[in-house]
Every structure is written in structure tokens, then in C-alpha cells.
Amino acid sequence: MSQTPSSPVPRGGGPSRLFILRPVATTLLMIAILLAGLVAYRALPVSALPQVDYPTIQVVTLYPGASPDVTASAITAPLERQFGQMSGLQQMSSQSSGGASVITLQFQLSLALDVAEQEVQAAINAATNLLPNDLPYPPIYSKVNPADPPILTLAVVSDALSLPQVEDLVETRISQKIAQVGGVGLVTLAGGQRPAVRVRLNGAAAAAYGLSSETIRSAIANANVNSPKGSLDGPTRAITLNANDQLRSAQEYQNLIVAYRSGAPVYLRDIASVEQGAENTQLAAWANNHPAIVINVQRQPGANVIATADAVLAQLPQLRESLPASVKISVLNDRTQTIRASVSDVRHELLLAVALVVMVIYLFLRNLPATLIPGVAVPLSLIGTFAAMYFLGFSINNLTLMALTIATGFVVDDAIVVIENIERHLENGDPPLRAALKGAGEIGFTIISLTFSLIAVLIPLLFMGDIIGRLFREFAVTLAVAILISAVVSLTLTPMMCARLLSQESLRRQNRFSLACERQFQRLIAGYGRALRLALRHPRITLGVAVATLMLTVLLYLIIPKGFFPQQDNSLIQGTVYAPQSISFSAMAERQRQLSEALLRDPDVASVSAFVGVDGVNPALNSGRLQIVLKPLADRRDRIDRIIPRLQALAARVGGISLYLQPVQDMTIDTLPGRARYPFTLQAMSLDELQTWVPRLQARLAQSPMLKDVNSDWQDQGLVAYVNVNRDSASRLGIAMQDVDNALYNAFGQRLISTIYTQSNQYRVVLEQERAHQDGLTALQRIYLTAADGSAIPLASIATVEQRHGVLAINHLDQFPSATLSFNVPDGYTLEQAIAEIDAARRAIGMPADMTLHFQGAALAFQSALDSTLWLILAAIVAMYIVLGILYESFIHPITILSTLPSAGVGALLALMISGQALDVIAIIGIILLIGIVKKNAIMMIDFALAAERTQGMAPHDAIYQACLLRFRPILMTTMAALLGALPLMFSQGVGAELRQPLGICMVGGLIVSQILTLFTTPVIYLAFDRLARNTHRPTRGVPAR
């Protein structure tokens, strides 16, 4: 029954009074929050994780035919010197291989990517004069992290057209359109077969005519030009000049006259074969074991994956229409599918958590009107949070949805506390309005203290450093906003609805089930009362249990295995293939094709794309890349951790290769794609030091059971033909070293000697020795040089050739020579143990002090997170102590409240150990949240005890005993609500479940143990501090949190 209009309005109500007395205004305010949240929800972007990336730029310079030494000294070093002067540069790594220089620049998180781009462009401009004059392509930079897997992989094939023709269509009609899409950072063509005219020189035939390869190169270059010719400007007309100065086809080049001998023309066809082919014949790609042009689309750092991929996919129908009917485009991999599936799973878990929480409320209250009130408050608080997320620039992702799922148990707590207190006054005979005002007035500041002390726990998360801190900022802020909105709803809508929906009649109206539940609950309260009296009579035992819990928490923290992030199953695997270092391209291509064919036999594999050849990603001819797309999780027999060993067993049947596989993760911290999950870099002053110590360290680590798949990118057994020119002999013949270099480059470097210009694209003319004359060292015997008198001189007459071993790639870290090793952690061991083992191995082999070891990517982030873990937890405790001390005006009572924390720590750590989980970053977040949850029990007890002492003059013993019994029901309800809110995360099985399970396990384990212990330890500690204060003659009574 509500108050009649003529009845005087009761006093009280605290901050809720206005909202209780103005139900229409309160209802409209809540509707506004609801609508704002719904509108924001539809506008929020979707992603796997918060968009947090280091500003990263990759600079690629191609120099076909150059050795790693030449690439490093002529291209990489000049560029590095300029890049090293840029402000905000955090790390610079480079890889100089045969024909390609790749420099990766990682900037500080605080630097905007556009600013970094301007600095890079300026540095490239400054280095231009220092680069080789015959460099066929200028340095090209891309706003992309090379370690970030493609968001889309497309395959383009044709039964009617050759691959060079398909490549030309892709370059002119597809790749440029995709690159124009907002958020796309880089579009690469794997297996690129750009059309070109290939001139394959017959050295012996040219020498017979007395022609050197340099003479032929000059003749071709001079015969194909595209330069301005001016115009004629007469009295009445203007005429533009043009000429047939370009040769556009292989046929035209065959008929090119390169010289005259005895008055007769020497055609190019007489001394070379000329054909229409590919610019680089040492590149190949396959899509599901069929030759193809594979398009990899990578996003810019910070770009939304789903928005970018959707924009690209939306263009595919139009792009297909622009291609001939024989050219087919297929999507091999779409990363958004697993991201959408993962987010969808978390949404379902969120809805399940809400349903479980409402069910718990009904079981405790056994009253539909009373259940309806928190049933409205929970979704309203969660939906309202979306509005704040939109204005803060957040996205709907795994972490923000996890925060909302956990918040389900938090936000209902406030409503439960308010409803339970108002019901108590109704049972005591107060009419609904009076009960609402009195109950809300009594509990209002308790709600405020609960809210601010819980938000205080989240404050340290906002100050976590580096990329991990940025990652969890959205999680912490989303959870804090949900808690804050919940407090507002509980102080406004909840008491207003109680005044209108609850009545003494509704409380008395109970069925048999309700009566049976109530009897059982009364027995439970009575049993708790007896156990509590026993604990209060034997305080030393209870205090001993509390101290033992604290000690056990410390012990468990020290011994529990520690990790970084759980390994996710995103249905995508990246593979790196390595063969013997001296393998030829054709042999490597055949093994890669065989491997692709073998992997496709696995029933859980949906598609395989494979690539070999040297480009901006692949460092050497003996390496290749794989991208393996698995079937959706629901359609597979096994999860990814079981599939990988199976695929490696299939690869073992293909002889002469090593295959390294690692699952693609949502969070990419590395800057270079590696063979294993955890990389570290050895940096030295010279390549000789690396040659000595890298194999030793790798061999030592390979023997350790704490690491597996130990490997390095150090390759120094490639075959090198060292041409030792007798300079004296060459000088007598009038042959310069430049002539020798040009002859070798013209023969074996796939030298780009001229450019064919068209309206839509540019094509190159490639000069090389005939393929049959490139089969070994004997090919050098067919090289001729032109002496000063015009005679043809064999290279062998002035030079000797020595076969040596050399490096296939030269790597730098911050301009110093380096080698990167990487490893995986076997089951039963942790990343913490593996890192300790690496440090021990380094000391054991006696590595010099001037060689430095730098952990990279995930290993580096783990070390940073591990170092800050204890400080993070301590900061959360200190923040909570300060807030509670201010609210209670006491130095003692916050300590009583914080004494509940060790029990939560024991429960969380034990749960992790029992389930076989490591204490990783996600689990640490769970422990920090537990700090905020479990202290609610103590706050509700102490707040009521202090109020009883102050207003009723009760003794501390009687006050805390009464407070424990009065608050037992809401304590049990709130704990069960939080526990069931975390339960869906604990038992999560969908895509990306590995990321969510540790959080749920921590929450459930910590809540169960803390619920059992704190009901007894908190009142005992409260009385112990009271006695201590009385014995020291200090005032003990703080004030309730008002």
C-alpha cells in the first residue's frame, strides 16, 4: 500500500529522497539512460581487443641482385643513420638480405602515427643522395606492423591467363582500390609475377661479336626512352612532338639492332633470347596448392579490424565485375569471422550471467515484485554503460564485454542491499513509502562507500604502463562506469520502485516453496549464529586462521607458475618453413608445394596459402611462409594446440625442411614475424661475435626441458662464390672493377635495365644470363669483359673464384648487428621459468658482457607485467585504504575491511593451480577485482555495527554480532550473484574462451573461499582492534560511511 495523499510525507531518505517522492521524473531519467545506451550500442565499433598498437612503420627497399653485405652497407646503413635521429623512436630493427632491405621503426605509444610518418618521409628524403644511383625502386614505407597477420587474404587465379597477366590485372584493378580503403596499411602480393620483358644473354655468342654485356645493356636502355621532345609553335598552330622512342613488346626487342659487325647488323635475337615473362622469376605462391596471386591485406596500427575488412569485402563484387570472366577471386582468410564469433560468445555469456543473477535474486527473495526491481536495475546499468563507452571512444570487444559480464555481479549488489534493507522495515510494520525512505536513508552512504571503494581498486589499472596498461584501460573504465551507474540506479530507481511495488501483503503472500526456502534459510542463519558465537568465544583460533591465510597467500604467490597471456584458438596458424641454406629456388618451391599439399590432407584444415621467394617479408630463398586457416571451432575435431603437432607430423614426411607453427593471437606485440611465440635478441659489436655465441646459446637452450622449438634467424652457412680479381692484370688490360661488377650484375642479378611506360602501369626490361648458364660456378667461366683494345677477355683470366660460407641476412637492432632467437614454452612449464633458464644459460656458457640480450614482444611485455604485479596489487590495496579511511574517519576500520583480502587470494590462487592455469595478466586482473568484491562483506558488517554502537549504544560485541546476522542474507546474496556472474566466464568454451577462463576461475575460487572465511574472521578482527584501541586509551568508534 502506498501513502495516501493526505498522509504527511515521512522524513529521511538521504540522497534518495527526491527520487522516491518524484517517480515520474525518476522514470523518465532512467528511460533517457536506457535510450542513450541502446543508441550507443548500435554505433559502437566491434573488435577483438581495444585498439592499442605501437605506431609502427616499415620501410622496404628492393635492390635485385645485391648480396646481404651490399644491401646492408649501401642501403640499410644510410637509412638507419637518418632514422636514428628521429624523436620518439623507441626501437629500430632491420634485415638486409639478398636483394631486399627491410627496416621496422617502432615509435613510442604517445606519438601519433601521422607525425611518425612525416618524420620517416623526411629521413628518407635526407638519405636519397647516399643511396646507390642504380637503385631501381626508391625506399617505400608503409604504416603497418609486419608481425601483425593479415586481416584478409585473397587468392586470384585464372585458367585462361598466365600468372604475369593475372598479376597485371591485380595491380591495376584490385590492389590499388583495396589500398585506398580507410584503415588499410599495406596490400602485398605474394608470389608476385609482375609482367616484364626478359632478355637472356648468351655470353659466348656476344663475345663472338666482341660485345660485352654492358654494351648490350646500354644499347637496350638507349633504344627505349620516354622523355619530353618539346613542341612547335608557329604563327597559327602549335604542334606537339612525339616519336617511336619506346619498345613495348618482346618482339620489338628481338629486332633491336645492338651493333654492326663488318657492316652487318647484330640483332638482339642473335645474342639473346627475348620473351614476355615475369620481372622476378624467384617468387611463387599457392592457394590450396594451386599457383595463384595471393593478396594479403594488413591494417594500419590503431585501425579497427572489422570496419576495415568489411569495407574491403564490400568492394569485392565491384572488383569482380571489372575482371575477365576467367579470373576468380576467393577469400582464403577473413579474421573478422573469429572476432565476431568470439564477441558473440561473450555476449551470450553476458546474457547468461544476467539470467543467473536474476535467478539467484528470486531464490533469495522469493517475491516477483522484489525480483523485478534488480531485474530492471541490472540491464539498465549495463546498457547505460554503452553510452559512456561511445563518448570515450571505446569499442565492443572481448575485454569490455568481460568487464560488463563481471559487472553483472557487481551492479546487482547495490540493488540487493537496498531492497533487503527496505524489506526489513516493511516486515517491521512500516508502510511502503516510509520503509523506502528509512531503508534508503540508512543504506545510502553504505552504497556510496561500496561504490567508491570498488572504483578505487580499479584506479591502479589506469596507471599500468606500456601497451598492457593501454589494453586494460578500457576494461577498468568500462567496469568503473557500470559500477557508478549501478550506484545511481540503486539510489534513485530502486528505492522508488520499492515504494511502489513492495507491500506488507506482497511479502506475506508466499507459496509452499517460498515457505520451505525461508525455513531452510532461517536454519542457515541460526547455524551461522551458533558458529559465529563459537568463533567470537575463541578469537585466538580465528585470528590464527586469518594469519595462516595471509601466509598461505604469500606462499602460493611465490610458487604458482606465472605466464603472460593465454594462447587463443582463433582458427588461424602462421607457419615458417626453412630448408638447407644453400637450396636453390626451384628446389625450395617444390618442397613448399609438397608441404602445402600434405597439410591440406588434415581434416581440420580449411585452406592453406604458401609463399617462397625474397621480398619484404621473406628474408632468404631457403625460407617460406604459410598461412593455415582451420575450420570453424564447431566443425573441428580438435582445438588448435592439438592440431599443430599433427600438422608438424605431416610436415616431417616432406624431407629436407623444418616447419615452425604458431597460432595467430588477437594481440600482436612483436614487430617481426617469428618462428615461435617468444623472441629475444642478442646484440653484438660485430658479426663475428654473433657467429661465435648464437649457435652456442641456441644449442644450450635446445637441451633444456623448459623450452621447445628453440631457433634463431642466424644463418651463416649459405654458399658464397668470392670473385678475387687480380687488380694488376685487370689494370693492364684496361678493365676497371666497375666493369667486373657490371658484368656479374648483368649476368646474374636479374638487372632492371629499362622501363616500359603505359597509360596504366610501368613494366621493366630484365637482363640476365641464359638460365642454362646459371647452374653453378662454371657459369662464371662464360663471363667476358671488354679490354681497352676491344677484345673479349674471359673473367677467369684475371680472377679466381673461391667458394665460401656466408650469411644469408644481416640483422640490426638499433644499428648494431643482432640475431633473434625465439622459443615456445612446453606444457608443464611457464614463461617465467623459461626466461630464468635463458639467463642461466647465458651465464653458464660465459657469454661476454658486451653482448646484450633484449627480450622482445610478448616476452618483454611479460617481464614488465611481472615486475609491476606486486606494485599493482599493493597500489589497489593502498587506494582502497585511503578511500575507506576517508569515508569512516578512521585508521583502524579500513584495516579490518582489508583483512578479508588474503582469503580471496588463497581461493583464487588455489583455483588456478587446481585447474592447471598460470597466474597470467588476466588472472591478476581477476585478483584485483576480487579485492573490490570481498571487502563488501566487511563493509556491510562494520557499517551496521558502527551505526548500532552510535545510535543504540550497543557494546561492540553485541553490535558486530547483530550486524553479522542482519547482513548475512544480503552478504550471501551479493556473493552468490557475483559468483554466478563469473561462472559463464569460467566455463566458457567458444572462440577466444582461453582469454576469459582465467578471470572466471579467479573470481569463483576467490569468492567461495572468502565467503566461508570472512563471515567469521571479520567480526573477530573488528573486536580485536576495538580491544587494542581501548587498551591504548584511544577512541575507536569511527563513523559509518556517511
UniProtKB/Swiss-Prot annotation:
It holds the Pfam family ACR_tran. Its main location: membrane. It is a multi-pass membrane protein. The chain crosses the membrane at residues 19-39, 350-370, 372-392, 399-419, 443-463, 475-495, 541-561, 872-892, 893-913, 914-934, 971-991, 1001-1021. GO terms for cellular component: plasma membrane. Coiled coil: none annotated. The keyword Transmembrane applies. GO terms for molecular function: xenobiotic transmembrane transporter activity. InterPro entries: AcrB_DN_DC_subdom (IPR027463), Acrflvin-R (IPR001036), Multidrug-R_MdtB (IPR022831). Belongs to the resistance-nodulation-cell division (RND) (TC 2.A.6) family. MdtB subfamily. PANTHER family: MULTIDRUG RESISTANCE PROTEIN MDTB, PTHR32063. NCBIfam families: PRK10503.1 (NF007798), RND_permease_2 (NF033617). This is Multidrug resistance protein MdtB. It comes from Edwardsiella piscicida.
